[in-house]
A protein has these predicted regions:
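N-terminal helical cap/lid subdomain that shapes the substrate entry/recognition surface
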Residues: 2-120, 134-135
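Asp-based, Mg2+/Mn2+-dependent phosphohydrolase catalytic module
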Residues: 1-16, 44, 111, 115-118, ...
Length: 244
């Protein structure tokens, strides 16, 4: 574990990325997720439909990286002609979420880490670039027993921006009731979205460098973290040092 200096400022809030941070990184077959959906929604054209959804999803993520513009699953489905009000769509979406479930489990370090932060009077936040709804993410947190440990969360599917846009970080700070970004820390696994974005927005940043991020998902700038941790649970010691 390595860290930088804190100056005289204290930490009032710690905001976490979700995928690759609160839940460990998983390398997956992106086409397979949509085959599971399409085989329920339109079995006769599952290969074609899954390819179209994957292409639309890729375009949405690319717009997020290049222009910090958010998107939703609903927009993607509508864009490829899916009837989002149909029973077969709801059944397909359920199959999609079932496929994802093994890849969404919360890191075992998270419950004691979040509880430790809150015991110290530090607010806990989440800021995630996601296409999914708040309801989906809260169901994951509830399943893993950590929903009540989160004071505020912002999902890019609910706002116009994605990380690293400073407005996304501002929204996360507002969600946990912190005015001064210098009194907040962001923890994430992506040097561009998370570390560069947080630093540009005025937060301190902690990198958890465990994710095998594809080159196509890396941004053009890598931020310089204030600390790097070997495991998520080490964040508490970093915050304690900065608050000493």
């Amino acid at each position: 574990m390595s860290g930088g200096t804190s100056g005289h400022r204290t930490v009032d809030a710690v905001v976490f990325d979700w995928g690759g941070t609160l839940t460990p990184w998983h390398t997956i077959d992106l086409r397979e997720q949509w085959l599971h959906y399409a085989e329920v929604y339109d079995p006769a054209h599952a290969d074609e439909l899954s390819a179209r959804i994957l292409s639309a999803e890729d375009a949405a993520w690319r717009a997020g990286r290049e222009h910090q513009r958010s998107a939703t699953l609903d927009q993607i489905f509508r864009g490829v002609g899916v009837d989002v009000d149909s029973d077969r769509h709801r059944d397909g979406l359920a199959a999609y979420h079932r496929w994802w479930e093994p890849h969404t489990h919360t890191d075992p370090d998270v419950p004691p880490l979040l509880a430790g932060l809150r015991d110290r009077g530090i607010k806990v936040g989440v800021l995630s670039n996601t296409l999914s709804t708040r309801e989906h993410h809260e169901a994951v947190f509830r399943r893993d027993g950590v929903l009540d440990l989160v004071d505020g969360a912002v999902y890019s599917s609910e706002i116009p921006w994605t990380k690293p846009h400073p407005h996304a970080f501002r929204a996360a700070l507002d969600a946990v009731g912190v005015d001064d970004p210098a009194r907040a820390v962001f923890v994430g696994d992506r040097p561009f979205d998370d570390i560069h974005g947080a630093k540009e927005a005025g937060l301190r940043a902690v990198l958890v460098p465990h994710s095998a991020i594809p080159d196509s998902q890396k941004g053009h700038v890598e931020g310089e973290p204030d600390a790097v941790v070997d495991r998520l649970g080490d964040v508490l010691a970093v915050v304690d040092r900065w608050n000493a």
